[in-house]
Amino acid sequence: MEVGMIPRVYLGHEWFGAERILSEYQVPEDCGAQVLFLGIPRNAPEDGGNIEALEYEAYPEMAIKEMEKIRQETIEKFGVKEVFIHHRLGLVKIGEPSFLVLAVGGHREETFKACRYAVDETKKRVPIWKKEIFKEGKGEWVLGEKKNASGQTK
């Protein structure tokens, strides 16, 4: 499913950007809420402060199928009108967006919940792997979701 040339579910090296999606998508007249999540790699002190980029890899056929399933589940579960789920592959520098979820719905409450659900389920279920690339050039695969000192998922 696409909006113009922008797919609802996307996994790849090209980045469409939130601005383009928001400007090209015609929001239905009965929708009063759009909730956007952007996942952006960071170089946090708790990670050693030595990360330059993240490199993402995936099993595309399986990942896209699962992303489409999550999109449909989100629409059905929360009654929102539309959901976009995009994830970049390849090298993504610190500060550049790598993951986007946009939920569009009638009201803010279900739209916020839908966006959160799509983000969380994508992180849990979609086979996307990331490697931390350090400033000295070495890389290290991240196994599972990292948690910070307070137990929050990063």
Swiss-Prot record:
Single annotated GO MF: molybdopterin synthase activity
Function text: Converts molybdopterin precursor Z into molybdopterin. This requires the incorporation of two sulfur atoms into precursor Z to generate a dithiolene group. The sulfur is provided by MoaD.
Binding site for substrate: I40, P41, R42, H107, R108, K123, K130, K131, E132
One Gene Ontology CC term in the entry: cytosol
Keyword Oxidoreductase: no
UniProt keywords, alphabetically: Molybdenum cofactor biosynthesis, Transferase
Record-listed E.C. numbers: 2.8.1.12
Organism of origin: Aquifex aeolicus (strain VF5)
Entry superkingdom: Bacteria
InterPro entries associated with the record: MoaE_sf, Mopterin_biosynth_MoaE
PANTHER family (alphabetical): MOLYBDOPTERIN SYNTHASE RELATED
Reaction equations catalysed: 2 [molybdopterin-synthase sulfur-carrier protein]-C-terminal-Gly-aminoethanethioate + cyclic pyranopterin phosphate + H2O = molybdopterin + 2 [molybdopterin-synthase sulfur-carrier protein]-C-terminal Gly-Gly + 2 H(+)
GO biological process annotation, one example: Mo-molybdopterin cofactor biosynthetic process
Protein's name in the database: Molybdopterin synthase catalytic subunit
Top EC category: transferase
Family from the record: Belongs to the MoaE family.
Tagged with keyword Transferase: yes
